[in-house]
Design a protein with these regions (language model features):
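C-terminal capping/gating helix-and-loop segments adjacent to ligand/active sites or protein-protein/ligand interfaces
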Residues: 312, 375-430
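Mature extracytoplasmic/periplasmic domains
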Residues: 34, 44, 59, 113-115, ...
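Extracytoplasmic "Venus flytrap"/periplasmic binding protein-like
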Residues: 59, 63-136, 172-174, 276-277, ...
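Glycine-centered hinge/linker elements that transmit conformational signals in sensory
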Residues: 189-192, 230-260
Length: 437
């Protein structure tokens, strides 16, 4: 599968280079013998698109005679990138283009200087003034609109959490190779797997964000946030349904049928064949296919009984943080390249992210053939009707509130507190933080 993916990416990037070589209808940068150098900040580790980031940047640089892009990886996901951006901004330095996680939409727009995509288009790409409206569906663009109604950036990486299953282990344990469909069944499967095979039954991703856990609790009817009649936003996850959801995973960890380890360790345990089920982003699809030496598949995110599936949109949008004219122009030219059909296809093939642009899936030079052959993408695509926004705390509380959620998760999964104790105390602390703004 590894060679097939790399070949597919190479073919799609060849198309993207042809587009660039043919020239695009955008205002050229000021005449200069030297290239304009810009930084592109991302948080894609090698196992989650980092190699494809490098390939996209290398191909752009090879075909562009006036811009050089330098990609900079930021560990600890979008929270880590925001912390690094905060440190750079304090010194007056900004990268040109950055990935911003959905959970930090309001925090970013409240605390950092940026150029809206339409403003960049209106100045540097006037011949393609309706690019956003032509290439993206309104509900997709809405994901990158802040609470003030401004289009802060353009959706880039779209993901949903799916359940990866090792069908070989399921068969060995005498379970259905189609996997569980509800969270109650996930718990039952995990227990049987541990008893029959001695292997771990389940792992839920634990990176530096609460994204997967939001899907867990909101699918049970809980809400991360609530809005009062006066518009006040409060944390609301410590409801009976939210507590039940988190306690289910904590109980699996306590009885030894589930893992409580870092994201990389959990991923490695799954692809090594030591854990039967892994709940994580579809963006790990490519890395999983390349590493797993067993019958691997994905199934849709489990529901709670007959309740509707509710899952947060994962991934990020791209925002222009360049401050000078040449940097802004270069950032937009590179960003538009990233949104070409060919580049979008390469991004999906190399990761698993669902393309946000509306004409990529069916395009001959896009994903038409790939999606027809790659069934592991189906689970993510088929559950897009259950997607909601990743909870974004209002005002300046985003980073601190997210860290509180991570500390709460570690305490609950680690057995230091019950779900009820941890969630109620953390909810109160976050609401005190929000009220103090």
């Amino acid at each position: 599968m590894k060679d097939l993916s790399r070949k597919a990416i190479a073919l799609t990037l060849a198309g993207a280079m042809a587009v660039l070589a043919g020239g695009q209808t955008m205002t050229v940068l000021a005449d200069s013998q030297e290239k304009t150098v810009i930084e592109y900040w991302h948080c894609n580790a090698e196992t989650q698109g980092g190699l494809t980031v490098d390939e996209l940047v290398e191909n752009f640089n090879a075909t562009n005679d006036h811009i050089e892009v330098v990609a900079k990886y930021n560990p600890d996901m979008y929270k880590g990138l925001m912390q690094n951006l905060q440190a750079e901004a304090a010194t007056g330095n900004y990268p040109a283009l950055v990935q911003i996680g959905w959970a930090f939409l309001d925090y970013f727009s409240n605390n950092f200087a940026y150029v809206t995509p339409q403003d960049a288009i209106d100045v540097y790409d006037t011949k393609d003034a309706s690019f956003l409206q032509d290439k993206f569906l309104p509900n997709i663009l809405e994901l990158a609109v802040n609470s003030e109604g401004e289009q802060v950036g353009i959706p880039y990486s779209l993901s949903t959490p799916v359940l990866y299953i090792n069908r070989d282990i399921l068969r060995e344990a005498g379970l259905s190779e189609e996997g569980p469909t509800t969270w109650e069944e996930v718990s039952e499967f995990a227990g049987v797997i541990k008893e029959k095979t001695g292997k771990y039954g389940f792992y839920m991703q634990e990176p530096a964000d609460f994204w997967a856990q939001q899907g867990l609790v909101e699918s049970n009817g809980a809400h991360m946030l609530s809005t009062a009649e006066d518009g006040t936003v409060q944390a609301a996850f410590a409801s009976e349904e939210g507590i039940e959801a988190m306690q289910l995973v904590a109980d699996m960890i306590a009885d030894g049928s589930a893992l409580h380890v870092s994201w990389e360790e959990g991923f490695q345990s799954f692809v090594d064949g030591n854990c039967a089920m892994m709940y994580t982003t579809i963006a790990r699809r490519a890395a999983t296919q390349e590493s797993a030496q067993f019958d691997v598949a994905t199934v849709k995110s489990p529901t709670w009984g007959d309740k509707e599936r509710v899952i947060p949109a994962g991934g990020c949008f791209l925002a222009i943080t360049a401050q000078e004219e040449e940097q802004i122009a270069a950032a937009w030219e590179f960003e538009k390249y990233l949104y070409s059909v060919e580049s979008m296809a390469a991004w999906t093939i190399g990761t698993g992210y669902v393309p946000p642009r509306n004409d990529v899936a069916e395009a001959e030079n896009g994903l038409k053939d790939f999606l027809a052959e790659n069934e592991m993408m189906n689970a993510a695509i088929e559950q897009m009707d259950g997607v909601v926004s990743w909870a974004s705390f209002p005002g300046d509380a985003g980073l601190q509130a997210e860290q509180m959620l991570l500390d709460m998760r570690d305490q609950i999964f680690g057995g230091q507190v019950t779900a009820e104790e941890g969630m109620k105390s953390t909810q109160n602390a976050i609401n005190e933080l929000l009220a103090a703004q």
